[in-house]
């Protein structure tokens, strides 16, 4: 019996038999010792008692084995679970998606909790709350009724499904429709704690908290008056209606479209505008004379609007004039750019043809018998049929000079000479005849102009010279002043002294010698005069006594002078 039960147990747990074999053997040894003791004690009672005890012992052994197997199974399962837990804790989770999913589950759970909490709160009008907007911190505000809101704010209520609360912000009193997710209750304790904490805060946020503290309920809230609603409605109407500037701009735009012909648009004729030929320059008349367009303006603001129309219309007209000028300048600039580009492209193509013809026929080392005349014929045909050629292109590229040289070229093969020269002659005599005549006339005019200019310059020079000569003859030379004369004399004296030192006696010395000679001659003449007087006196004395003439005293106080001595 024991062997059968053991085999059944082994069949039930074949994988775990090896692990618990040591425990089973130890228990079998203990049971065997116990059985041997029982056999010894009961040997005296007889063989039957021994058999009974053995059977009982075998049954107990089987029960013990089953209990041990169960306990070993439980221990093994516990150890396996512990090993699994240690493996999971030791190995780090490399899957980032699992971590994100766990975090998202946590955040969703928190959000659900918050939404549940916010849904539980019943936000009533007059309740102070903190409202969250994107880009701003939680801002103090108050839940209000729709009657406290302006018409514009009431119209801005969201149409999607859900509950939305009208909120007014402190201190600017701006309205917003928001859901319960963006609201949290604001108590007076939270306000005082915020204001007492020394955290960095903005002035507007502090002002908002102070205003929320001073307005505990809806009755103490001062809502914007109805005038602001009227002004908002008027501003909406003004924004929806076109201004005079926009009307003028639309009119000018329609006129431009019809002028260009890109879009066909019917324009009604207004007979009242016949007296205004320049509508853009007088925008005020445009606004006043158009009865079809009526501006809806409140009576309070009609006077101000009428006063402000004239400067706005003037600005509009000036802006339109500037725009027209800019467009005209831009169109002119675009036309100039296009003309420059076309001229440049034509110039490059003519220079290419000139280079090909010159290199193939006019190069000094070129053998004319080995030239590919098919290419030459192709180049000449392109030149003959060239579109857009004019005088500036011919003058700048000098293509006509190359064609003339090819036309007068000698040494061309007889097979190709007639063909080449016929094309060149056709270009010079027929196709470019008028252009070449114009160039020659321009050259003649330039030469004539240069000659006339030279002649006029020569005549001007001659007239200037003649006028200078006449002026020198007619106008006397001015005499230099006295000071200048004295300076000149001193300079001359100094120069004479220098010459005397270097070259011997000068003219002054000669003059002094002449002066001394004159003095001597004068003395001689005076002596001769005295002798003649003495002789005359002697002659006068022959009438009476012989004596010298008696010179009486001079009349009228004239002193007598002794001629011999020269004294009085």
UniProtKB/Swiss-Prot annotation:
It holds the Pfam family PWWP. Residues 1-126, 213-340, 465-568 are annotated as: Disordered. One of its GO terms (cellular component) is nucleus. SUPFAM superfamilies: Tudor/PWWP/MBT. Residues 125-189 form the PWWP domain. One of its GO terms (molecular function) is methylated histone binding. One of its GO terms (biological process) is chromatin remodeling. Residues 255-266 have a biased composition (Basic residues). Residues 1-19, 48-88, 100-122, 489-500, 514-541 have a biased composition (Basic and acidic residues). InterPro entries: IOC4-like_PWWP, PWWP_dom. Residues 214-228 have a biased composition (Low complexity). Residues 29-46, 281-292 have a biased composition (Polar residues). This is PWWP domain-containing protein2.
